[in-house]
Amino acid sequence: VGSPLNRNSKRLQTVRNSNDSRLDRSLGLDENITRRDFLNSTLLASAGLLLTAATPAQLLAQKAQTSAPDDFNGFGGIGDYANSNGNTASVLEAGHRIRDGEFENLPASIVETGETYDCVVVGGGISGLAAALIFQQLAGKSKACLVLDNHPIFGGEAKRNEFLVDGQRLMTHQGSAFFPVPYPHSFIARFYESIGLKAPRLEYQKWGGPGPEMKLSTTPYLGSAPNGTYFGAKFGKPEGMWLIGEETWERAPIPAKTRDELMKFESASNSEAHSPRYPGDAISRRLDSITLEDYMMERSGISRETIRAFLSPGEGAGYGLGPDALSGYTAYAADMLHPLDISDETGQQMFPDGNGGIARLITKTLIPESIAGEHSLDDVCRKPVNFGALDRAGAAVRIRLDSTAVWVKHEGDPAKSDFVTIAYTHGGKTYRVKARSVVMAGGSWTTRHIVRDLPADLVEAYSQFCRAPCMMANVAVRNWRFLYKMGISGCQWYEGLGNYTQVRKLAMCGAHAPTIGPDSPTVLTVKVVYPYPGHPTEQQGHMGRAELLSTSFRDYERQIREQFSAMFASSGFNAARDIAGIILNRWGHAYLSPAPGFFFGKNGKPAPGDALRAAPFGRIAFANTDLSGVADHRSSIIEADRAVGQLLDQVLSG
């Protein structure tokens, strides 16, 4: 029968479960809408597993035994990308087999394809696609190139999510977002023109009302469009408090000392005395020797506690972690590498699916039949992918999807070898191809494992590439009148999941409707990063990944619905009625997080990016945006161009 204590515990648990069920229903978790096509969800991993520091692979194995098939991936949307929302469980499992040493030796059952290519590109993100295109442009179509991509569709983090909401097809980005208008005579401008992006300033939706026009951003980032700041229970405001307009900190429910520090920090300017004049000068090298947090404290007198409470991860979100984990040079690295206008007024441009539009344009240029229709922005954005055209025998360039490279090694001495062996998994089997040259355009976290004869100095270089996870949660809402009623189109907050969201008007090349207004359906993106201030940079990445991978779709969905309800219910928002769908894009290694010493080296050794860029290793050259230290698709393209040039000049020229 059990003790009275146990009976009471069971009764309390029954009441709690009943209350939870009622709350879930009020939030819309059991509504039959497009957010998911399954009913049962359980947590991916138990608290006990987390406390024993389980690896991501163990967490996924636990999930496979105890959870519904979609408990991790959740609803993936509609269209070509429906089964490729972020790193899906199958992509993660394939990658973790590499990390866990399953391919230290190739299996006896390996399938010999008999294929030999002039160039194999490992990685089908923007860097890999750009490498294939540049190889084709420079080497000619008589040379054969194969791109191996581990996802169900090309693009890497430059992919889209699509929803169908009240008859309107909505499109948004999974990761890589905007592109600045390039200098007209720059390499990037010439590259854009070569893929059909000849007029990089896009046309956007117009205001359609009803009601007075509200300024809207063209990107998902807070800028000059009207926005507000929310303070909730964490700040002694259980009913919520909104501050809209100027002088937010002056009115915020925070201690006077904190208020003064934040106001002083915001008013501080980057004087020339603080700013590097060129990469590698004395100022930039000193900044690279300290953390961004130390630099912020030194420059404006702000305390460590205030930085971590209000400016983390905001000041480091472009690198995935907070200022305590990053090199001080990250304050300037992007502007020094790409000194362009990125204002939301004139500089930032964005396809409806973010830089997925760039990836699609490159692919259409490589393989004209890959996307239906003409080579126009409108058709490339709107028309479906012809998957059958991607990997056709005899084509100059082939893109092989769902193919995870697990082994890259020279045949014999790298200095004398004529070929590189590449093994990859696909459909439960392992296959082998040969190449006269290889571009490693995937992420540093896989390249370091799969290049089997990588020399010690490059192994050491790759050990300095720390990566942080990110989740892009895309929330489709039937309208955004709840924001319009408050006089805002975006907002930020300092508690809960993520820290900002923004309504944006879409570029016309992919927008369903020519106008937008408060009654229009839209997608609100919530970017979630996982800083653990005070821990070493690499450890923060591991801790963040454990959190990202151990949380079920349903649990994240509940958090999003609760948070939106807390913030917006007072202006008429109803989660069960107004949320039409949620897609989670989990990126386990989304951002390079450069620790001090990454950009210019330390202890007399070169910067890791410089070591990998200097020359090919045998017949292998290295690309990917990682090497630049700046997560930017332009860096991906520039690194691809350098890698292909090295191979053509130093490896394939004989």
Q: What is each stretch, according to the model?
A:
Residues V397, L401-T525, V529-G534:
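Mid-domain catalytic core of redox enzymes
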Residues S267-S403, P414-S417:
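Active-site/ligand-binding neighborhood in enzyme catalytic cores
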